[in-house]
From Swiss-Prot:
Family per similarity comment: Belongs to the ATPase delta chain family.
Entry membrane topology: Peripheral membrane protein
Descriptive protein name: ATP synthase subunit delta
Chief place where the protein resides: membrane
GO terms for cellular component: plasma membrane; proton-transporting ATP synthase complex
Subunit structure: F-type ATPases have 2 components, F(1) - the catalytic core - and F(0) - the membrane proton channel. F(1) has five subunits: alpha(3), beta(3), gamma(1), delta(1), epsilon(1). F(0) has three main subunits: a(1), b(2) and c(10-14). The alpha and beta chains form an alternating ring which encloses part of the gamma chain. F(1) is attached to F(0) by a central stalk formed by the gamma and epsilon chains, while a peripheral stalk is formed by the delta and b chains.
GO function terms (MF aspect): proton-transporting ATP synthase activity, rotational mechanism
Length: 183
């Protein structure tokens, strides 16, 4: 089963809770820090170890979260981490964080695109792309820029699974495909 399918009910539940008390930013921080902690090999080994008591795992995760966040976890946050551990779902925390952020963006009418370019775009080029995308989608737009030296020119615009490839490489590949079909 895909992680997103398992993570979605958790993300939705947290989002509903955050809607009630306007704690989106607080939850986003907890989820992002928790997801970050799971990048660490030692943390993943600790969680997977059958020799460490669940209570000790929970205490360690909570202590690390509080240390990084520089505050105590509230009752809902502590319970959430406990539920994930009890149900062997702590590993889906990165997926929950991603889905939660998507829910925030949908609610705030924000669309995030990944722009892949062969070079670092100038400020005016970024502004032009954002303006064009805002006009096309009628939403607030945020872009992440990725430089790919293998592109000859142009850009690739990614919106989730959708890809708009207006790179020279794509045009050359398309031309090559057409030529190969005619011979």
């Amino acid at each position: 089963m895909k992680l997103a399918v398992i993570a979605k009910p958790y993300a939705n539940a947290i989002f509903e809770l955050a809607q009630q008390d306007n704690s989106h930013l607080q939850w986003k921080m907890v989820l992002d820090v928790g997801a970050y902690l799971l990048l660490d090999k030692k943390m993943r080994r600790l969680i997977a170890s059958p020799n460490i008591l669940e209570q000790d795992k929970l205490s360690t995760i909570k202590a690390l979260l509080m240390s990084i966040l520089n505050r105590e976890l509230d009752a809902h946050e502590a319970m959430f981490i406990s539920v994930l551990l009890d149900n062997n779902r702590i590993g889906i925390l990165p997926s929950i964080a991603t889905l939660f952020e998507s829910l925030i963006n949908i609610t705030n009418n924000i669309k995030i695109f990944t722009i892949i370019s062969s070079y670092q775009l100038s400020k005016s080029e970024k502004e032009q792309i954002v303006s064009d995308l805002m006009n096309q989608y009628n939403k607030t737009v945020s872009i992440d820029i990725v430089v790919d030296k293998d592109l000859v020119g142009g850009v690739i615009i990614k919106d989730g699974d959708k890809v708009i490839d207006i790179s020279i490489k794509a045009r050359v590949d398309e031309l090559g495909l057409r030529l190969s079909k005619t011979h």
